[in-house]
Structures are given as structure tokens and as C-alpha cells.
Amino acid sequence: MSAVVFSADFSSERQWVAGRSWAYPDGGPTNQGDNKLDHLTADSAYSRLGTFRARRRADGLWDAGLLTTEGSAEGFMVRTGDHLETTVRLPTELGAWPAIWTWRDGGNEVDVFEYHPDNPDLLELTNHVRRGQSYVRREGVRPGAVIDLGVTFGRRSVVWTLDGERIFADGRGVGSGWQAYLIVNLSVCAGRYHPAPEPETVEMSYEVRRLLVTRPLGGYLTDDDPPEVDWPVHGPAEEG
């Protein structure tokens, strides 16, 4: 049994801080060392309606939307054993780099997903805490598609699902004491690893229609993860 402990209201300033994150050098607004053209903005039009936007600036960077629970009044953190579910509409423009991920104290990063439209059918799923990763290709993943993603942050294995199907279990997990803040954002690629936006593109977006986190009632009573968290690594995940 589990209970909902977080249901995203992107308009809530108690839940979310807009336009800055300590995952960026000095809290932002730029992170060009990570091949990003982002110039983070707190303008509500870029994130607070659940549509995360980026618009080209005269200086070559892009005003970009980012929300994080870090520094908010509620300060919500996901922790070991939590399960996150989200519904997103993927972007269509080359150079768009949407992501939902976690961060705390210079690390604790797990990428719920990253996506690049130049690899139209591929999702990037990464556990940076213990170095588990998969590149998963699916026919239902494509620019503009609406997909349901789930992640269970298990002690011994982080498990991802797509539209209800398990697609990857990393067999590494996040450990027993892990916790981290949520980040939802749209970055813009600078061209090193994926194409930069085409010259005629001036705006891009993706949509997060739903995001919630559930937690086992009463926590874990033993040192073992529940069975659904400890799925084996083998399965339909495809390494790319």
C-alpha cells in the first residue's frame, strides 16, 4: 500500500521555485559548460502553466523555463522507495532538451527521462548516483507524442516504466539514505552532442500534464526493498 505524498501544482510558489537551481553553476542562469544555451527565467509563462518553453534571445542564448522544489517553502524531496509518475508531451523542435530529474548537494541525480528530437524514438534513462543507464527505443516515442513514464527509486534497483511497461531496471539503486529535490525543465542544446536549434526556430516547448509521487505507507519495515522495486535487470530495455 502507498499514498500520494506529492502532486505537482506548477503554479504553486510553495511547491516550486522558478528560474534558478543549484544544479547550474552559481544557481544559474546559464550552464554553457554542459552544452546548454539556457538562460533561466522566472517568468511564469515559461513554466508555471505546465508547458515548459524556451525562446531565442538576441544574444544567442534562450530564455528557458525551469522549476525545482529546492528552496521552496515546502522543500519536497523524493527518497528511497518512492514512485514517481508523469505524463508528458514531447517537443518537436531540433535542439529541444526536456528533462525531469533529481538533484541535491551537487549530486544525487537520477534522470526520470531526457529526450532529443534528433533521436526521435529514444529515451535516455540514467541513475547518476550509482551509474546505471539505458537508451530505450520504442515506437510510441516520437516528437509530439504523449507518453506516461514511471520511476521507482529503489535501494537496490531504479526501475523505469513507459506506458505501463517495464523498460529498464538498473540493478544498482540509490541506496537506503538517498533523497533529492525535483527539477522539471526545458534546456536547449548548443550543438556539441545533439543539433542546436535550426536558424528559423525561435520558440520550443514541451508539456508536463501530470506529475505525482507515491510512498509506501509506514515506510519499509526491513532492509529489503518491496518486490516491485527489486525487479531483475534483464527485460525489454534496449541499450543504444
Description of each model-found segment:
Residues F52-L122:
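Secretory/extracellular carbohydrate-interaction modules
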Residues T161-E165:
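Short strand-turn-strand beta-turns centered on an Asx-Gly dipeptide
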Residues V174-G240:
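Ligand-recognition surfaces built from glycine- and aromatic
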Residues M1-D82, L212-G240:
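Low-complexity, Ser/Thr/Pro/Gly-rich disordered linker/stalk regions
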Residues R79, R142-G144, G177:
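Surface-exposed coil/turn segments at beta-strand junctions on protein surfaces, enriched
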Residues A54-A58, L90, F153, V188, ...:
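Short beta-strand segments enriched in hydrophobic/aromatic residues
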Residues T126-D148:
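Short, aromatic/His-centered strand-loop micro-motif at the edge of beta-sheets
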Residues P143-V159:
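Localized edge beta-strand/strand-to-loop motifs within extracellular or lumenal beta-rich domains
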